[in-house]
């Protein structure tokens, strides 16, 4: 058994990647999976949950985010659906997320505060507080987001901002390394200094992939990507200091093929 708690991400409907991750788990190469609770028809949702539960792999659940139509801090931003439809959709999505966590025995539910329209940060902060008032679960774990993506701002980019958003409602946090690097590049901050600020938070999960050197855009690149610019020395120094905190790899394209190799890359970086 490896001396770190590494995991990989899989969508609820991605059976090919789940099969690969089950083999990696059986081999002892990973110790958990992060399940993206993407919206699915009810029957398919229950069927997929059953298959994941049957794998016996410990699970972290990732709640749907704005890419799935769930945008807590500004539900109607960048969305032309009627507001009543949006709100009903979010309620159903969060209900399914809690159901997934219950079924899979997940102790962690990763949450994004969301994106908002330029100039709307104050309103977004208030809306997110309202969201937490209506969705109060001790498993909710707030993740830091890049400062911007595709031209729109996102809420909760630094340790200080996450703490302010969480207030007393959320006590657990997810540190996403490439998101923090994108924020540091965009705001011209020191990545190492911003990383240090997370020592004051109760970080329950790490997210890891790579970004291009100097980039402000989160691309979920491989750890050994030739254009990678993430400060891996600083990242792995923190991972070793907090070896008991799970670290989840997150990739988007060709996941089944990418994860098999990236688990090995991670092991090599850890050994170094």
PLM features: what roles do these ranges have?
Residues 1-88, 92-95, 172, 272:
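N-terminal pre-domain/capping segments
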Residues 2-10, 31-35, 59-63, 109-111, ...:
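Hydrophobic faces of well-ordered beta-strands that scaffold small-molecule active sites
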Residues 9-13, 36-40, 64-66, 114-116, ...:
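Active-site beta-loop-alpha junctions enriched in small/polar residues
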Residues 21-28, 42-68, 95-105, 126-137, ...:
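Acidic (Asp/Glu)-rich catalytic clusters
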Residues 37-43, 115-125, 148-159, 179-192, ...:
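Active-site glycine- and acidic-residue-rich loops that bind
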Residues 70-91, 152-156, 179-244, 253:
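Gly/Pro-rich active-site loop or hairpin
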Residues 72-172:
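Active-site acidic/histidine proton-transfer and metal-coordination neighborhood
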Residues 256-272:
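C-terminal helical cap(s) of enzyme catalytic domains, especially alpha/beta-barrels
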